[in-house]
Structures are given as C-alpha cells and as structure tokens.
Design a protein with these regions (language model features):
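Active-site core of metal-dependent hydrolases
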Residues: 27, 117, 121-240
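Conserved, mostly hydrophobic/aromatic
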Residues: 17, 41, 90, 146, ...
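His/Asp/Glu-enriched, well-ordered alpha-helical/loop segment
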Residues: 196-204, 223-314
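Divalent metal-dependent hydrolysis catalytic cores, especially in the metallo-beta-lactamase
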Residues: 19, 35-64, 82-96, 123-135, ...
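Active-site mouth loops of central-metabolism enzymes
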Residues: 20-32, 53, 102-109, 152-156
C-alpha cells in the first residue's frame, strides 16, 4: 500500500480503557455496542480496544460481558469492518467505596475468587483486565488467582498508600488505572500507591491525557518518570444516558463529579506531544507499543515489523488520522492509500 508523500504510517493504536463509542455504552447496549465501537475507533487510528464494563448490578455486568464477547466473536469471523475487540475489562465492582466516584456504592462488592471465576466464565476466556482496589478485604486472594490465570490486575479506585502499592505489585498487580484519579493525591510525606507504580519497572501507568483529568505539568512529570511505561487510555464515557453531560471537555454526572472523558486516542497523542514536548514518533509509542505490552500482545501488535499483524494508521502532515488498516484490510479512508509514504512512526 502507498500513501501521500507528506503522510506518516504509524502502528495502530490500542485503547485499553473505553466504556463505549459514539452514543453507545458497553454496559447498556452490550453486543450492539461492539460494532459501533469497531467502526468508530478506526476513524481515530485505533485498531484494537478493550471493552470496559463499569460497576452495575452483578448479574447485569456478567450478562453484558457475555453479550459483548459473543458479538465480538461474530465480528471477528466477518472480518474487515473496523477495530478489533481485544477482550473485556471489568472496572469494578471490587472498589474502595471511598474512592468509587461515579460508581454506585450499593453496587460495590467484596472481591472473592468465586466472583472472579464468574467473570471469567461470562467472558468465555476473553477477560483480559480487572480493576480493583488492592487494599480491600479479599483483594489479595483474588489478585493471586487472576495473576495465575494470566489476567491483568489493575489497581484503581483505591485508597492505597505507597507500602500497600508495593505489596500489590508483589501480588501481581501490573498496571494502575487512570493515574492520579480516584486515588489519594501525590503527597511528599505520605505517598500513595502511584509512587510505587512510578518506581516499579514491571508495571505500567495508565493516563487520561485530556488536560482536565490531569494537569499538563503533571503529565510532563509523569512521562519524565515512566517514559514508555505510560499507557494512554481514554476512559471515554459517551454522555448518552440521563444524568451525564459534557462539560469543559469531560463527562460529568449531575453532581459535577468527573465520570469519564470525551477524549479521542489521536487527540491523546497530540496532547502528550504538547504537554511533554515530544515528537510524534515517541508519543505514538504510548498509544500503541505500550498498551500492547500491557496486554501481553507485543509479539503481534503495537509496532510495525515483519511477521506482525498489519494494523496501522496513516496520519497527514497536520497529524490527523486519514486512513486505518486492520489486519491488512483498509477499513477507513481507503482513498488515501495510493502514493508513497514519507516515514514510519513507532
């Protein structure tokens, strides 16, 4: 394939934390949301996403997971329509009630291995990540179980401090959900678990890089500390339900609490470039290779190399996505795939 000479080919991006797309939510629209997300995400240069299920009545969470997996499998068999669903992420219900934010308190549950098994069964083997608070009762046993199953344990919606964070990493927690958000502030005398994840090379740190959830100077500081271990994640929340609105670039609940972002992955890359003074070829790593490593998919995804899956996006000279290819098949902006390329990022 050839593209315009002023264009750049870069690896397809992966969003590991998304709650839906357009006007659909995975929790509510379930299977039907997968195709909408698949077609929507490629417009941003995203070739893979993890469908997020947020805290809700337990049985409804399990049902949503099952429906999403069935729909994703059907789309995979059809092939060539858009971004691929790479698995399921349960953001809850095993959270610290004090840091639940917009997650309803009466739906928060104590983590148990039995419930973890129910998650796995509902996802038909496609559960790839679970966000839980490492300090709550039962979290240690569940974290060990999930780690043994090869499922990523993400620390989030947590009151954990530094020591608890280090213990969590020792148990198998490998990533931090939306750094700085829904956790204690960064305190120089009594640091939170964020510092543990910043220090520990085995981990990654996810960030909502919209300039609202985390101020640009803190984004710069975080990048300087963790570099390619920083994973750009949108945590986008389509404001399609009652009680939510877009305000100042973020989605808020009726009481003003941040409920998620209105962020696109391509904008997250441009923001990181601006906030941390990075060239494109470095910032794109945090939206492609870094999330691929987090999910254990770096052998097939995240970079452009011989033998890897042909997932990539074409960016124009103004760093706007103009075409996306998934598995070697053009799924967006095929008209732009006709001339020679100027360079390859990532």
């Amino acid at each position: 394939m050839e593209v315009a000479p002023e264009s750049t080919i870069a690896p397809g991006m992966i969003d590991v934390h998304t709650n839906g797309a357009e006007d659909v939510l995975f929790n509510r629209d379930q299977g039907s949301a997968v195709e909408v997300a698949a077609r929507s995400y490629v417009k941003q240069g995203v070739t893979g996403f993890v469908a997020g299920i947020i805290t809700a009545p337990w049985e409804s969470m399990l049902h949503a997971a099952s429906e999403i997996c069935e729909s994703a499998n059907q789309l995979e068999e059809q092939g060539g329509i858009g971004a691929r669903c790479l698995g399921i992420h349960f953001e809850g219900p095993f959270l610290n009630p004090k840091f639940r934010r917009v997650h309803r308190g009466d739906w928060v549950l104590r983590p148990t291995v039995e419930r973890a098994r129910e998650m796995i069964d509902a996802c038909h083997g496609a559960l790839v990540m679970v966000t839980l608070a490492p300090e709550v009762e039962g979290a240690e046993e569940v974290a060990r179980f999930l780690f043994d199953q090869g499922i990523v344990c993400a620390a989030g919606h947590t009151a954990a401090k530094y020591r608890e964070g280090m213990l969590a990493i020792g148990l198998g927690f490998r990533t931090l959900t939306h750094a700085f958000n829904a956790m204690p502030p960064l305190d120089h005398r009594d640091p939170s678990l964020l510092v543990a994840f910043m220090q520990e090379a085995r981990t990654t740190v996810q960030l909502i890089c919209d300039g609202y959830h985390v101020a640009p100077p803190m984004v710069d500081l975080l990048y300087r500390t963790v570099g390619t271990r920083l994973v750009l994640a949108t945590d986008n929340m389509p404001p399609s339900g009652t009680g939510y609105r877009i305000d100042g670039g973020v989605v808020r609940s009726e009481d003003g609490t941040m409920a998620g972002s209105a962020l696109r992955c391509d904008q997250a890359v441009r923001n990181l470039m601006s906030y941390a003074d990075l060239p494109f070829e470095r910032a794109i790593i945090n939206a492609s290779a870094a999330p691929a490593r987090l999910l254990g998919l770096e052998r097939d995804l995240g970079t452009i190399a011989e033998g890897k899956r042909a997932d990539f996006a074409v960016w124009d000279e103004e760093l706007r996505v103009v075409a996306t290819v998934v598995g070697g098949t053009p799924v967006y902006g095929a008209v732009h795939l006709h001339q020679r390329t100027a360079g390859i990022g990532g």
